[in-house]
């Protein structure tokens, strides 16, 4: 992490993006980077693209059928307003996503940019036309990479953690508590292959070419390799 801190600070980056496939550990990595930068005296804040998803109600009203996490399920107008404000050093208001109910809540927060902003999420750059128009707002982008088989194992272990913690009937994972292990695995694998890996193939993996740094993670989610890259320019269609 020391080397990554050096690269971020050498680039004088104020807006840092952390991306990669679902369940690869973006939030964990981003929090570790926040801590490492703060130890070097930097002022750092972190936010997730999850907070810019449409709510279930909005998805229904807009007749958006794409699975949550695909580019069209984000409120790209609000997201771009946020990116513009933060890049200008202005305050920005955003909504809050709940991983318990898997939906946007009624809570709103005010983000006051100071120092470095780390923004983590699966689809950092896409606008409403599925074009990678928002790359221009990021000074430095880190792409997390890993063997998909390892990521699936981590994803499935997290499913079990969520099920064990689901005590509220409104929790997305509460119904799983009455399912057999075979049924849990069948549903999880179906979701993983049909939604998560499809999102990865169509939208997430192509952003690797637009990253400044590719970080490969091993089975223990430790950094095994760093590869500096020259990001592509222009808009990805």
Predicted segments with their positions:
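NTP-dependent small-molecule kinase module
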Residues: 1-6, 112-113, 179-237
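Glycine-rich phosphate-binding loop used to anchor ATP phosphates in small-molecule kinases
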Residues: 12-13, 78-133, 195-207
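Conserved nucleotide-sensing/catalytic segment adjacent to the nucleotide-binding pocket
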Residues: 45-48, 53-102
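Post-Walker A helix-loop "phosphate-sensing" segment adjacent to the P-loop in P-loop NTPases
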Residues: 35-45
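Hydrophobic positions on the alpha1 helix immediately C-terminal to the Walker A/P-loop
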Residues: 29
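ATP-dependent NMP and nucleoside kinases share a basic, alpha-helical "lid"
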Residues: 105-167, 236-237
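Conserved lysine of the Walker
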Residues: 26
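Extreme N-terminal, non-catalytic leader segments
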Residues: 1-17, 21
């Amino acid at each position: 992490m020391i080397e990554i801190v050096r690269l971020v600070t050498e680039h004088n980056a104020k807006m840092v993006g952390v991306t990669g496939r679902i369940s690869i550990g973006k939030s964990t990595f981003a929090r570790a980077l926040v801590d490492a930068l703060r130890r070097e005296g930097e002022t750092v804040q972190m936010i997730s693209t999850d907070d810019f998803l449409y709510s279930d109600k909005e998805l229904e009203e807009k007749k958006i059928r794409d699975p949550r996490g695909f580019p069209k399920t984000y409120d790209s107008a609000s997201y771009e307003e946020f990116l513009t404000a933060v890049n200008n050093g202005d305050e920005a208001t955003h909504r809050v996503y709940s991983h318990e109910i898997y939906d946007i809540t009624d809570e709103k927060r005010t983000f006051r940019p100071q120092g470095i902003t780390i923004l983590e999420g699966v689809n950092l750059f896409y606008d409403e036309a599925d074009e990678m128009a928002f790359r221009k707002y990021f000074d430095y982008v880190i792409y997390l990479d890993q063997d998909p088989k390892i990521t699936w194992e981590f994803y499935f272990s997290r499913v079990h953690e969520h099920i064990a913690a689901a005590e509220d009937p409104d929790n997305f994972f509460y119904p799983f508590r009455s399912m057999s292990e075979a049924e849990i695995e069948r549903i999880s694998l179906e979701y993983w292959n049909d939604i998560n890996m499809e999102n990865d193939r169509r939208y997430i993996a192509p952003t690797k070419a637009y990253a400044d740094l590719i970080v490969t993670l091993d089975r223990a989610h430790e950094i095994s390799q760093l590869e500096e890259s020259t990001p592509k320019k222009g808009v990805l269609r």
